[in-house]
Amino acid sequence: MKGLFIRTYGCQMNVYDSERIRDVLRPLGYAPVETPESADLVVVNTCHIREKATEKVYSELGQLKRMKEASGGRMTIAVAGCVAQAEGEELIRRQPAVDLVLGPQAYHKLPEMIARASRAIGDRLETEFDTVEKFDALPKTREADGPAAFVSVQEGCDKFCTFCVVPYTRGAEMSRRVDDIVFETRSLASQGVREITLLGQNVNAFHGPAPVLEGGEDWTLGQLCRHLSKIGGIERIRYTTSHPRDMDDDLIAAHGDTPAMMPFLHLPVQSGSDRILKAMNRGHTADHYRDIITRVRAARPDIAIASDFIVGFPGESDADFEATMQLVRDIGYAIAYSFKYSSRPGTPAAEMHGHLSESVKDARLQALQALLREQQTEFNASQIGKTLPVLVTGKGRNAGQMHGRSPYLQAVHFEGPDDLNGKIVDVKVIGASLNSLTGELVRVAEAAL
């Protein structure tokens, strides 16, 4: 067997891609190893969404270069993902120790690229946008890694937000065939997977070809979620990341009529200022976003809302930032992710006037995060005394402790036997912190027996 080490940066889609890279390489005799030093092939699966993430990649490659030299050149280094797509030849120029560079739509070609590299012939670079070919070429079954799994259903983005590199690194929106998604999900369920998270850059833009036996028009995400909920063993369904422009009535209704859909919605808004939303090319207003949340909560009153925010976008005034703070107060988030604006080469926002100083961006980020932490702490504390169904995902740090996730995606720690792993159990919440809950085991839910 040959050793394979994969370092994954960035989003859940990259985590999924890394899992599929392992699937692609398994027939070639590659098996995962714990450290890069013991690997014959190291794959760095990269993120290009912010400058800091890109620089982490180059730092990692410097360390791998030294390991490769120490191994006498035995190690093969491959760079995959969005940095590979965006920088291509520049990446090879900056770090000649890299053997292979492949974009996120080309990892099904990795076996061929490895073969070419071993013979020192052919191109070291693959960055074509052939998403359909990629999904057709991937192994139809996957090896599950625990009771929860990601399933990619959509890739690419047609929205062209002015701050974002995704349309340039992931390509146009493309949805997988429903039959292929169902086959993959059934395979995972047969291995004990209880929860799936449907992935896409704009997952609620999903319009996948309908099942062959049913025909008709392309299916929406709401239709897909209802269908997947009928697969035996699949008891929980989530999806991420969604866009307000694609939050249609049927998907909102599915949150109310499909019990397997978890009461958790991650719907990024980025700003509460209409002026900044327009400059970002988001295609919606703050009030439109508020209306979506109102309708989702009407369909599923117990739903928890999550979001993403960018502070310090070019031209953002004090009034614009206050509009964001007011939106946060109005909505009340269970959790949210916030970042300083990071200029990305090649995006329209990078060429805009009015870039803010780091000190202003820092101050605004601190203020926003303080408010978001307060809301997250309050939401977690509101669970104390409640009994929640928890999907057990493994052992905790302490002896006799297990951990899992609540319907609201909170980490939950409780004492219990090891054989609960993979089951859904009832846990009474007795404590809460910013990032997790603690509880007492009540019973194993009937569906898990």
From Swiss-Prot:
Residues noted as binding [4Fe-4S] cluster 2 in the record, renumbered to the chain: 157, 161, 164
Names of required cofactors: [4Fe-4S] cluster
Keywords tagged on the record: 4Fe-4S, Cytoplasm, Iron, Iron-sulfur, Metal-binding, S-adenosyl-L-methionine, Transferase, tRNA processing
Domain TRAM: 381-443
Family statement: Belongs to the methylthiotransferase family. MiaB subfamily.
NCBIfam families: miaB-methiolase (TIGR01574), MiaB/RimO family radical SAM methylthiotransferase (TIGR00089)
Protein name as it appears in the record: tRNA-2-methylthio-N(6)-dimethylallyladenosine synthase
Organism for this UniProt entry: Hyphomonas neptunium (strain ATCC 15444)
Gene that encodes the chain: miaB
